[in-house]
Amino acid sequence: MTGSWEARYAAEFFGTLILVLLGNGAVANAFLKNTTGNDDPGLANGGWLLVASGYGLGVMLPAMMFGSISGNHLNPAITIGQAVIGIFPWAHVAPYLIWQFLGAIAGQCLILALYWPHYRQTTDNEAVLGTFATSDHANSQLNGFVTEMVGTAVLIFGAMGLYRGMFFHQNIDIANIGVGLLIAAMVISLGGPTGPALNPARDLGPRLVHALFPVPNKGSSHWEYSWVPVVAPIVGAVIGIWIYKIFFGL
C-alpha cells in the first residue's frame, strides 16, 4: 500500500461507496417496479445474475482503482480479520471501519435518490428493504448466522489465495478480476438464504438509511436481525484467514 493514511481512509470511503452503489443499485434495478431491469417487483429480467454482476463489479473495480492505496478492504470483517492475524495495525482499524460505514451510507443515499420514483411505485416493503439490507428468508437467525459466517470465511480464504498465490501475486490486476468473480459466485451460490451480506458495512450502513430516511413504502428495518450480518462476517473472516495461515502461511 502507498500514500498517507488520510489517502487510505479516502480510498476506503470511495471504494465502499462504489461497492454499495453498484451492488445495491443492481438489487434496486432488479426488484423495484418499472425499472429497466424489471417490469414487476421481484421478477427481474436479469434475475440473480444481474445482482451478482453488480456486486462482483462493485468489488473488482474499486480494487483496481484503490487497491494499491488502501488494500481495498471495503469491509470491516476484512479489516478486523487482518488485524487479528497481525498483518494490519490495530491503531488504524477504527478509522478504516468508520470510513467504510460512511461510504456505505453515502452509496445507499445515492441509490435512494436515483431510484426514488421506483421506490414510490413499489408497494412490497420487503422488496424495498432488500435494496438496502439483508434478511434470512427462512426467518432463522441461526441459519442466517451460519450462512454469513461460512460465506465470509470462504470469501476471505479465497481472496487470500488470489492475492498471495505465486501466480496472482505477480499479476495483481488478474487477482482483482478473480476476486470480483469470487464475489459474484458467492452471491449466486449463497445468496438464497440471506442475500448475502458478507460485509457489516454493506448491511448496517444502508439499514440505517432505511430506518432514518422517509423511504416510500418501507416497512420494518428488522433490527432484531441486524446483528447477524455484522457479527457473523467478522467471525467468518477470522476463521477464513486463520485457516489460510495454518495451511499456507502469510
Curated annotation (Swiss-Prot):
Report the GO molecular function annotations: glycerol channel activity
UniProt motif NPA 2: location: 199-201
Topology relative to the membrane:
Multi-pass membrane protein
Name assigned to this protein: Glycerol uptake facilitator protein-like 5
Q: Which UniProt keywords apply?
A: Cell membrane, Membrane, Transmembrane, Transmembrane helix, Transport
Q: Where in the cell is it found?
A: Cell membrane
User: Matching PROSITE patterns, A to Z?
Assistant: MIP
> What's in the GO CC field?
plasma membrane
Going by the entry's taxonomy, the superkingdom of the source organism is recorded as Bacteria
